[in-house]
């Protein structure tokens, strides 16, 4: 077990904060009926003060934690149903994000809150598809175009998350002694910076997030 931890230490470049850390101060908006859009295996039940609905697309494998199986642009609930929506690292995987945003607006109650996080500087990651990335202006545009009011929008996850992801993909594909030594040298440094550095997060963000309100 100890040997496995040592191997992981020298062979893992990336560090991703927990969903608790990512949502952070915005947890206070997760009250009432809350939709976890594109939930997958991500558990936010401990963050919700109210009733949680986990939604995801059908995959052929039953997940007892999913309450709603549907496309994200066709959620089978009535209008004005949810008090809050969490959509974390999902919108890049949908073919038509504007259509999804219109559906979010439909199913949310007036005065409800949307927490939406999207990637900017991140490699392609299929789940099962991967269509787009979002700049800060692009994120604001799709939110406001669909009649949400932006409360706050900001970069989060630092540039080291981007660099470490790329280095992880590249260097772990190489098996020579040289590249293995490079992994042992670089990966612990990158992982530390991912975890502890906020340098340039407002200028070179790996991702963006927005808190928006249905006025």
Residues covered by each model-derived region:
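Conserved short-loop catalytic and cofactor-binding motifs
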Residues: 7, 11, 88, 127
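A broad, low-specificity signal for short, low-complexity segments enriched in glycine/proline
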Residues: 11-18, 31-32, 36, 46-50, ...
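Short gly/ser/thr-rich secondary-structure transition/capping motifs
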Residues: 15-20, 36-38, 66-67, 191-194
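Conserved SAM-binding loop
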Residues: 25-125, 135-140, 210-213
């Amino acid at each position: 077990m100890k040997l496995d931890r040592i191997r992981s230490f020298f062979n893992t470049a990336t560090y991703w904060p927990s969903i608790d850390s990512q949502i952070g101060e915005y947890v206070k908006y997760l009250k009432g009926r809350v939709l976890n859009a594109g939930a997958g295996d991500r558990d936010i039940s401990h963050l919700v003060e109210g009733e949680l609905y986990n939604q995801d697309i059908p995959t052929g494998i039953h997940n007892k934690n999913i309450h709603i199986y549907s496309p994200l642009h066709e959620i089978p609930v009535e209008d004005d149903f949810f008090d809050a929506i969490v959509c974390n690292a999902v919108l890049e995987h949908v073919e038509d994000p504007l259509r999804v945003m219109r559906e979010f607006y439909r199913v949310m109650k007036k005065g409800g809150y949307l927490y939406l996080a999207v990637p900017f500087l991140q490699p392609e990651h299929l789940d099962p598809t991967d269509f787009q990335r979002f700049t800060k202006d692009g994120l604001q545009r799709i939110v406001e175009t669909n009649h949400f009011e932006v409360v706050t929008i900001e970069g989060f996850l630092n540039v080291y998350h981007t660099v470490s992801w790329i280095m992880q993909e590249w260097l772990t594909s190489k098996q020579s002694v040289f590249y293995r030594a490079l992994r042992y040298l670089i990966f612990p440094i990158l992982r530390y910076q991912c975890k502890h550095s906020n340098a340039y997060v407002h200028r070179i963000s790996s991702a963006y997030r927005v808190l928006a309100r249905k006025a």
